[in-house]
């Protein structure tokens, strides 16, 4: 056990923080290709048809990513931008698709909170 003097001089080494978005390989965003676009149902007690896509990332890893917002234009072979961020009621979905980037269109007629959905300001 170290003495207080040794701790003052050296300090303790912290535990390294484990990443929750390993497939991004340390990047904030990654490009990928949709291999499958489908809907899935959330865990209890919620009920819906959540839109998700299987995406093969440029890092070579295939992940499941959530498609946020109402309506989308994605299909197989669409090029998308993927960011981290899980969906609490969908097990195994730890990534989000960025709306308004690459092949993904922004959400139509979105008035508030437009930034996350790639919607332009209505004139």
UniProtKB/Swiss-Prot annotation:
One cellular component (GO) term of this entry: small ribosomal subunit
GO BP terms: translation
Residues that bear 3-methylthioaspartic acid: 89
Keywords per UniProt: Methylation, Ribonucleoprotein, Ribosomal protein, RNA-binding, rRNA-binding, tRNA-binding
Gene Ontology MF terms: rRNA binding; structural constituent of ribosome; tRNA binding
Domain of life per record: Bacteria
CDD domains for this protein: Ribosomal_S12
SUPFAM superfamilies in the record: Nucleic acid-binding proteins
InterPro entries: NA-bd_OB-fold, Ribosomal_uS12, Ribosomal_uS12_bac
Pfam families for this protein: Ribosom_S12_S23 (PF00164)
Subunit description: Part of the 30S ribosomal subunit. Contacts proteins S8 and S17. May interact with IF1 in the 30S initiation complex.
Functional summary from the UniProt entry: With S4 and S5 plays an important role in translational accuracy. Interacts with and stabilizes bases of the 16S rRNA that are involved in tRNA selection in the A site and with the mRNA backbone. Located at the interface of the 30S and 50S subunits, it traverses the body of the 30S subunit contacting proteins on the other side and probably holding the rRNA structure together. The combined cluster of proteins S8, S12 and S17 appears to hold together the shoulder and platform of the 30S subunit.
Family: Belongs to the universal ribosomal protein uS12 family.
Name of the molecule in the record: Small ribosomal subunit protein uS12
Naturally occurring in which organism (per UniProt): Bifidobacterium animalis subsp. lactis (strain AD011)
Gene: rpsL
């Amino acid at each position: 056990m170290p003495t207080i003097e040794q701790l003052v001089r050296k300090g303790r080494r912290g535990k390294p923080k484990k990443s929750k978005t390993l497939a991004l390989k340390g990047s904030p965003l990654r490009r990928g290709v949709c291999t499958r676009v489908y809907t899935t149902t959330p865990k209890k007690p919620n009920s819906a048809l959540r839109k998700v896509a299987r995406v093969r990332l440029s890092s070579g890893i295939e992940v499941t990513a959530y498609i946020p917002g109402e309506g989308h234009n994605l299909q197989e072979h669409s090029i998308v931008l993927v960011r981290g961020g899980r969906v609490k009621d969908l097990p195994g979905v730890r990534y989000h698709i960025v709306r308004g980037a690459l092949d993904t269109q922004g959400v139509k007629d979105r008035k508030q909170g437009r930034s996350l959905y790639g919607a332009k300001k209505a004139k």
